[in-house]
């Protein structure tokens, strides 16, 4: 055998000895500590991620519930506050609004979501000065769509995030022959219900508008879906008292506008007020319940899976510990 072959054999034997050398106690402790850190990480991380996921899912539920509750509180407070104004103030404010509707010049009616609907003009300022004894102009209730919301001046983004907006260029919502008021509401907001259910309304349904101490009832006569620039149906009609509720559609896409138009039903104010008072929309929506039920189901499933995983982990750790003890015993006997 050559000298080169002998050295190669010695090198191979040395490598095999190194590979077969058992780990020291210090190395074993380091390995165990690293494994423990990994186990703790994988034990803590899933619950943290689960809690974060639940909070993300619960946010729209909680936000929508609070906003719905607040909007209904404002609508109810509006009715109660009218008694504090006094009959003369109420009469004067309504007379001014009626006169405004009679004198308002015909103007092009534009889509509520256009930026040009926020004009800096004397005409717009005059409109804002009407029915301004309260921050809320009026309220609207739609029983078949589960709607009870305050109405504000204008259709600015900030306005439509807290309630319904009166579309500038249309009559104030005080009723009157030859008037047509247009009320705008969002649908698809992640933090409020607003006009989400306006598509439930059918011809023949009714809705109510309360403005100061005047109560108006409208019966739905027309429902249509149009493009944003198709506003002809929002014009006044001689001899008719009309109100249109408008929102974006389809849900979440918003390429069109849903128009729900009603004609005023001649009724005594007290009768309308009594009917309107019965409208009590649900603050909690069906989808909220579905989300909460889904979260509970996920929690139960997670608890079951975590229990199985924990049981298997303990079994595996016990087997590893037994194997280490056995290996240590074997090394001791070999020594």
Language-model region placement:
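N-terminal Lys/Arg-rich, disordered targeting/topogenic segments
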Residues: 1-38, 316-335
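Solvent-exposed, non-transmembrane regions of membrane-associated and secreted proteins
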Residues: 28-284, 314-321
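C-terminal single-pass membrane-anchor helix
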Residues: 276-335
